[in-house]
Amino acid sequence: MSPTVQCGAVSQVVVVGGTHGNEMSGVCLAKHWLQDPSELHRKSFTAEVLLANPIAVERCVRYIDRDLNRSFSHELLSASGSESDSYEAKRAREIYQKYGPKQSSLNFVIDLHNTTSNMGTTFLLFKGDNFALHLANYLQTKCVDPSFPCHILLIDIPEGGHVHLQSMGKHSVSLELGPQPQGVARADVLTRMRALVNCSLDFLDLFNQGTEFPSFETDVHQVLYRADFPRNEDGEIEAVIHSELQDKDYLPLKPGDPIFQRLNGEDILYNGEKQIYPVFINEAAYYEKKVAFIATEKTHCLVPALKVQN
């Protein structure tokens, strides 16, 4: 029998929208909750709301100078700063000054994102965060919507440490919902995200009030590598995502399956040695990062029971 994980009660929760200024579900919800946060009140806490990148939101772009969600490295946050720094570096330091240092008083971060890929409901969690895994399991069982199936995608901690906004919290989840075009708010996606946030707050409140959550088993996806598009000698893309791969996020891709198609009609096949599970397939925001899809492996894990520490 696995040991029970004990964690301190959750006192400070922040719901973040607009980390990317053109991911509209979180933008719309954050703006609404900043005007009327009553929906975020629970018996044991009231969640705060943060509009993370307001200038990017105003311009309806992902970011101004650099990706805010890659701007929370120790190096950037600890730098003295200057007028020539990027807007996002300055904004990351502002957020850090308000909620930092990392993983201290801020107990839980819920960061709201959209993707143009067919990712359904994806819970992005840091590897080893059993508390967040319990939250994801609660959402999978209590907040079901067949139109947006749930998946858990674990984030590796880079060698230099966390760079994501959600790393400000001791525990965290990024809700990644799609497909949804950039700069567009879809009612079905927004409604789904709103329900997930409310259900997340219910879980945190139940935990604070002493509810014990039993151990469970679940499937998780872990990143193997990032695959670029085929490119010519000038660095230009010379093939697109194959129609048989498009929208097949989280489905198995076997050696010999088509992944790209050249403009002359030639298929490019997956030549790996083992089955993988592609995610973020043809994500619009990843073209600049030279990522056509992210290859993952699916593993099964046992998560120990959870209860509040007295």
From Swiss-Prot:
One of its GO terms (molecular function) is hydrolase activity, acting on ester bonds. Its cofactor is Zn(2+). CDD domains: M14_ASPA (cd06909). The gene is acy3. Its EC number is 3.5.1.114. Plays an important role in deacetylating mercapturic acids in kidney proximal tubules. It is found in: Apical cell membrane; Cytoplasm. Keywords: Cell membrane, Cytoplasm, Hydrolase, Membrane, Metal-binding, Zinc. It catalyses: an N-acyl-aromatic L-alpha-amino acid + H2O = an aromatic L-alpha-amino acid + a carboxylate; an N-acetyl-L-cysteine-S-conjugate + H2O = an S-substituted L-cysteine + acetate. Coiled coil: none annotated. GO terms for cellular component: apical plasma membrane; cytoplasm. Pfam families: AstE_AspA_cat (PF24827), AstE_AspA_hybrid (PF04952). Zn(2+) binds at H20, E23, H113. This is N-acyl-aromatic-L-amino acid amidohydrolase (carboxylate-forming). It is a peripheral membrane protein. Substrate binds at R62, N69, R70, E176, Y286. Homotetramer. Binds 1 zinc ion per subunit. InterPro entries: AspA/AstE_fam, Aspartoacylase, AstE_AspA_cat, Aste_AspA_hybrid_dom. It is an enzyme of class 3 (hydrolase). Belongs to the AspA/AstE family. Aspartoacylase subfamily.
